[in-house]
A protein has these predicted regions:
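Active-site region of glycoside hydrolase catalytic domains
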Residues: 1-78, 94-114, 136-137
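Acidic/histidine-rich helix-loop elements
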Residues: 71-89, 163
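Generic hydrophobic, helix-prone segments enriched in Leu/Val/Ile
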Residues: 18, 51, 89, 129, ...
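Alpha-helix initiation/capping motif
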Residues: 42-44, 85-86, 114-115, 167-171
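Aromatic-rich peripheral "rim/lid" segments of glycoside hydrolase catalytic domains that contact
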Residues: 119-175
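Non-membrane alpha-helical structural segments and their capping/turn regions in soluble enzymes
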Residues: 5-16, 86-90, 121-128
């Protein structure tokens, strides 16, 4: 998820071409908000600092994916315990502020969440801490709901698409 200098440069070239293409395509596109991501949409400070946000365009938003704390939120073999705000969450938003927000560049967390490990209460506490920290910095966040809630792997599902209800209403209420 960190990549190397060459990979990060390819992403920068892609972002530049993307912005130029959208802006030149007519219609409302010169005024449309569009998003760019660091390499792998990674929340690593190294990748955020390497992102070259196109200059002179106040409608560019940086989108980052951040599943934190990793061992709790994304690592399926990791811990199912979460009891208090984790330093990785505060570090993320401090980094976002220093790298982007302080320079007038808006950021959205395009993906966040925590996998289902039969630990709803811990997930509720984590989402409350995550979102309250994000709110302090004015960063909106989108829970990644991939429709899966049980089994091995990345189970982020909240919405029961078949029956039209919530698998974990407590988490939805916390959001």
């Amino acid at each position: 998820w960190i990549g190397d200098a060459e990979s990060r440069e390819v992403v920068n070239q892609y972002a530049k071409a993307f912005v130029e293409t959208v802006r030149a395509s007519g219609g409302n596109n010169p005024n449309r908000c569009i998003m760019v991501t660091p390499y792998a949409a990674s929340s690593s400070r190294q990748n955020m600092e390497a992102l070259e946000v196109p200059q002179g365009d106040d409608k560019i938003i940086v989108s980052i994916h951040a599943y934190l704390p990793y061992s709790f939120a994304l690592d399926t073999a990791g811990t199912d315990q979460y009891t208090s705000i984790d330093s990785s969450i505060t570090t993320l938003f401090t980094d976002i502020n220093e790298v982007f927000l302080s320079k007038g560049i808006p950021v959205i967390i395009g993906e966040f969440g925590s996998v289902n490990k039969a630990n709803t209460e811990a997930r509720v506490q984590c989402v409350k801490d995550y979102l309250s920290t994000a709110k302090q910095y004015g960063v909106p966040c989108c829970w990644w709901d991939n429709g899966t809630r049980i089994g091995n792997g990345e189970n982020f599902g909240l919405l029961n698409r078949s029956e039209g209800g919530w698998y974990f209403p407590e988490i939805v209420d916390a959001i």
